[in-house]
Amino acid sequence: MCKFQAVKIASEKLRELGYKYIDHNLKDGELTLFYENMMYGTTDKMLINYRYFTSERLRAKVIEEVME
């Protein structure tokens, strides 16, 4: 499971719909999450723009944990 809150919440919701977290990519302030549809075996993407996080501290935490 992902460590930071926004991704954790998204992951939990998508898991309820039959998706499994695979990977992420952070580029130019956009966090793209990759999921596998466990029913059909397809890979889907979800984009989260971290610039929308209001807290600078939370943004820094998102970057730090994604880079681990």
What is the predicted role of each segment?
Residues M1-K8, E56-E68:
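Mixed-charge, Lys/Arg-enriched low-complexity segments
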